[in-house]
């Protein structure tokens, strides 16, 4: 199931930091041979209110066992130690032990990057240990498993968290007979597989109204627990185990910081978090101690907003009066999303696809940051499905550039819709790239004990040089991983970045394109992923303080490298890395140019995940319904018909049963709690049966060297109970079965059925009964529900069957009674499911005709099949031959995707006898009797696939090819196409506006097989005559092809001339525009110059007037000062005169007083005065007595 293609050889850069690659091979092998062992722990004791956990043999999280050819580097030493250790943990994925140095990992880490051949890659990886525990016994494992869904009434398909099985990207298929778990190579591939299986079970999913339940939950931390102990949590939904946290040591608080997200859940009542204390590793037989639980009613966390609270832990034995008990902080949100049939969203989706820019501009000012994130996510997913995401991101980025103007440093540093959109798109299409580029590096960093703290205030000066060397080594390693990941860079991101570069160049700002690309990729994706690996699903565990500090410093250096900036005075302690930054700037520029180069688009794989378009449209509708209600009426009027469309969808959602299309059944309803009683999950099944079932981990052969990670976890039927468990592993360098042209098995799953319709009573309709005209009516391709099915086994495939009869209509039942209905294969186009020898890509399956234009599983044209159908000479002859040999055609249709002469592997029932994949094939079975009156005896020797009776498993009829069997593959690879390029044919084709329907594809397949029959068996009994006829036909066909090619050449020449003329006209128009703009520019410059001269003259006049006014003011000031001085002199003189007058007045008053006294004395004595005294005033104002003269 793993995505792949041909292995690419990654070439490391010949940089100075590959010095450690010169270490001797023996030393590197010793480094790789170190291993760690983890003691086993068993399930915790059962307490009242607690649920039983998994048995002691369930493996902990296990890394990938094969080196991915698409990953440039591998931490081989680290993986060696992990894989060689026993796989015995039960409770969680604990913090990786820090018992060795990161430098010990480095040689193997880099030697894997420098490996140039696949055999050297396989040599680096060790063989998995056969025995997992003391109770393991080797038992024969099934190489091929069959999953028969033909008679199942209830099938539950759900993902399995990596903490449960110890394996990434697993999903579980639960039927009435048990559960099977499958492992894929990436989350996108797992989602695609699950969706295809769901469509096999519910083909009418997109035409039915459905409800989806989504839970997002964070287990953040716990408090009031005893210190120096490790604790972990188990997450149960309605008492079914869904996930575990890692084991964390109690310091101040127990901090987990782990988030879980679950989709397609049944309706939930309660969410329960069980708390455990981990026991000592040395005490192997002790169980983990159960402490208690936290129960959250689903209704308490329902809604669009997250609910974050401290919840008390309910313990089995509460301790009264001793303070508060332990508490856990949990953040959760439970959503119920109602999804209408796709037809109801048609107008809404078309409007969003064509008017996204105006919508974003209108809503940007009123949305909160969280709402912007949710809306950007929905828009990106919808436009990715409709093929408009590149235009959407380019338009948003250019509007962001226009908004920021000259402030380029603000781009992608604000919470805008453009920033959130590129974040969501990077997470959508870049998850596997992120895992390939940095996954193993981050895991090795978690494992290492290197200290990279270089802040002098946080470490001693003696340790500073060593820490600086550690940080430089880690940064070199991280950047080396990043720049060598260009070979696995997502094709969609290359297209977007190339579009940005082209748009910036057309706007005359080519320099800003580099900033756009580096800011989006590093600032919003790679650097946050380095700082917080758990948020980007690189690892489940939140890093401890030292690792978090190391990751932060690496992210700082990487971000400065992407910004082409040095460390300054703000972080002077990091200045020692400036030399590294300068040295790597050139490589960073080369990397940015490589990932935006449109010429290398065909060298990378595209996005292969699944997008639930109905769910995204429903989420976007709810967001827009809430946001548009907050807009002003003037803004709403600019949105066109969007408010009316939103009202229509809201009305359909509010009306029960309004979303049900006529003639359809609600097959996509989520199974309720009662349905989970069939199988509540693999873990619960194992526990309730007291380990009586047999669990097998079996690695299947892969079609490419990369496809090594497919596992089946099965439970036996209970006929032969055994407590034993086994693990089988196929080494990468073990010899595979030699097949034709060196190819291996073709695909991993085939969902094609032989659809039967009940005909006359008592007359069974076999799978060989095909329409005589070679066509299947389009109405017969609609999927309903079956009565019977005939599972067909393809060699080496894990097959899934679901029989679906066609609704009986007058046009089909009367015109062709008893005809079977043949549905197109429901497999999706993924290059890894096709042979590397140039086999044609199988068309995408059709769940229903109404979802072709909206679902991500919509059909695409198959160029090889259409070309093969177009080259047939006579359609009528083909139809007649088809009517004569329907049985042979039916068998050849099943083998259409296989190469001739391939030895194949029989499919086996999980309860039947099992055989290793490397055992020799059994003898071919005798051919079955031919249908009466249908197949000539001469064709019996060519029958390859004898079909079992309806309802039986294919293990009773092995599919080994018998001697003399001849199969031909009609594909374009026979015309000289390269085998390596053929699996990528799907990605090279652009989105076609009109995809062929199921009728056209079916006719193309049947006609292609008819041509093969005509070529193999011939039409006449005379071989020489047939050869001559064939040569004449080939000659005439070659002449026709030559004439067609000549016509195409003439048309191409004419179009080229037209394009040249158009280009010349455009060039002349552009030249005129350039000249016009140049003249306008010169005119504007002249106008500005004149304005500047006028302003200069005005300024000179103003200055001269100011100077004259200043002189006048100076003169006035001098005159005023002189006047003030003269006045001051007068004032001084007057003051002196006043003083003298005051003195004279005083003397006069004294003289008057004396005279008055003399007169008064004389009057008393009676003496008359003689010679009265005369006073005279002198010139000085003094009085003088005249008698004294």
Swiss-Prot record:
Residues 387-595 form the Ras-GAP domain. Signal peptide: none annotated. Expressed in vascular endothelium of muscle and aorta, in smooth muscle cells of aorta and epithelial cells of lung. Expressed throughout the brain, including olfactory bulb, hypothalamus, cerebellum and cerebral cortex. Expressed in the soma and processes of neurons in a variety of brain structures, including the developing cerebral cortex, CA1 pyramidal neurons and Purkinje cells. Poorly expressed in medulloblastoma cells compared to cerebellar precursor proliferating progenitor cells (at protein level). Exists in a closed inactive form by an intramolecular interaction between the N- and the C-terminal domains. The proline-rich motif is critical both for PI3K-AKT activity inhibition and MAP3K5 activation. The PH and C2 domains are necessary for the binding to phosphatidylinositol phosphate. The Ras-GAP domain is necessary for its tumor-suppressive function. The C2 and GAP domains constitutively bind to MAP3K5 and facilitate the release of 14-3-3 proteins from MAP3K5. The gene is Dab2ip. Induction: Down-regulated in prostate cancer and medulloblastoma. Functions as a scaffold protein implicated in the regulation of a large spectrum of both general and specialized signaling pathways. Involved in several processes such as innate immune response, inflammation and cell growth inhibition, apoptosis, cell survival, angiogenesis, cell migration and maturation. Also plays a role in cell cycle checkpoint control; reduces G1 phase cyclin levels resulting in G0/G1 cell cycle arrest. Mediates signal transduction by receptor-mediated inflammatory signals, such as the tumor necrosis factor (TNF), interferon (IFN) or lipopolysaccharide (LPS). Residues 59-73, 653-668, 715-731, 939-955, 967-976 have a biased composition (Polar residues). This is Disabled homolog 2-interacting protein. Residues 646-943 are annotated as: Necessary for interaction with AKT1. The record marks 413 as: Arginine finger. One of its GO terms (biological process) is tube formation. Transmembrane segments: none annotated. The lineage of its organism: Eukaryota, Metazoa, Chordata, Craniata, Vertebrata. It comes from Mus musculus. Residues 20-38 have a biased composition (Basic residues). It is a peripheral membrane protein. One of its GO terms (cellular component) is axon. Disruption phenotype: Mice are viable and fertile but show a number of cerebellar abnormalities such as a delay in the Purkinje cell (PC) dendrites development and a disruption of late-born cortical neurons migration. Develope a prostate hyperplasia in epithelial compartment at 6 months of age. Show normal vasculature development but enhanced inflammatory angiogenesis. CDD domains: C2_SynGAP_like, RasGAP_DAB2IP. It holds the Pfam family PH_RASGAP. Residues 1025-1159 form a coiled coil.
